[in-house]
């Protein structure tokens, strides 16, 4: 059974077609880049997978289930905009995650915080933007999920923070799960990607292994993307 299957999925906002007859299969054990220009349909696809939107037509299956209560148990989602209460202490947020998610590994979260010399007694609002992003990623990656969906995990942080975030993703990745990373900073993440999905005008225009794309095109993923989308 595939981890994710999208069959003829279409999503409209009024008359605007955000996703157009999307067919997609994702297997376990992959780190996948979901790449496309602004307005291409990336966020819509992510919201559909997370049961935040419902398709107008077609079917989405995650481990054989339609998006809902059961799939939320196995998906760990990092949205582009935070949902955390910055007045909470870090240890309070960790307790919240522990209470809410059966697969949350408290010891992993504290170990990752320790490596950054972050005091769990600190309130989130006292942290820099980069540190807040790291804490949010730590919370997401401390779950033992089967599918991680990260929406712009390295957006708005400095290069050193990006390296830490990518390293955290890799070290907490296991072969029984897959990770979908949506980002516009392709050159920063392409080294960790097993596969890439290019989406344009609501359609999947390419889904290929990273190595195969580099071999066939003779270009980096970032270079190929810029040429195809004229960025």
Where are the language model's segments positioned?
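Helix-to-loop junction immediately C-terminal to a conserved catalytic motif
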Residues: 50
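Conserved ABC transporter NBD signature motif
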Residues: 58-71
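Catalytic Walker B motif of ABC-type/P-loop ATPase nucleotide-binding domains
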Residues: 148-152, 157
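ABC-family P-loop ATPase nucleotide-binding domains
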Residues: 80-135, 143
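ABC ATPase "signature
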Residues: 207-208
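The feature captures the beta-strand-to-loop junction immediately N-terminal to the Walker
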Residues: 35-37
